[in-house]
Curated annotation (Swiss-Prot):
Lineage: Bacteria, Pseudomonadati, Pseudomonadota, Alphaproteobacteria, Rhodobacterales
Species this protein is from: Roseobacter denitrificans (strain ATCC 33942 / OCh 114)
Record-given protein name: Integration host factor subunit beta
Family according to the record: Belongs to the bacterial histone-like protein family.
Pfam families: Bac_DNA_binding
GO cellular component annotations of the record: chromosome; cytosol
Keywords: DNA recombination, DNA-binding, Transcription, Transcription regulation, Translation regulation
Keyword Ribonucleoprotein annotated: no
Signal peptide: none
Subunit details: Heterodimer of an alpha and a beta chain.
Role this protein plays: This protein is one of the two subunits of integration host factor, a specific DNA-binding protein that functions in genetic recombination as well as in transcriptional and translational control.
GO MF term list: DNA binding; structural constituent of chromatin
């Protein structure tokens, strides 16, 4: 499912809301989650999961094509840990 499909699904299930309002709400949610993660904060959605940022240390890597060793800088990457309710639902335990 892509963002536009999510917006359409929410708008269809809530006919009292205009699609442009739903789009604004969805975009605001994504902006807030992104902003919180950019600040290094954890975003937890109970039952669904938690978004956080993990630090990857600098390391020596290898170019798989040439075999040449390369220095890979330290970086921060997004991380998602599923919540118990989501995990159970995915495994047919709901």
């Amino acid at each position: 499912m892509i963002r536009s499909e999510l917006i359409q699904k929410i708008a269809d299930e809530n006919p009292h809301l205009y699609q442009r309002d739903v789009e604004r709400i969805v975009n605001t949610i994504f902006e807030e989650v992104t902003g919180a993660m950019a600040r290094g904060d954890r975003v937890e959605l109970r039952g669904f999961g938690a978004f956080s940022v993990k630090k990857r240390d600098a390391r020596i890597g290898r170019n798989p094509r040439t075999g040449e060793t390369v220095h890979v800088e330290e970086k921060h990457v997004p991380f998602f840990k599923t919540g118990k309710l989501l995990r159970d639902r995915l495994n047919g335990k709901s």
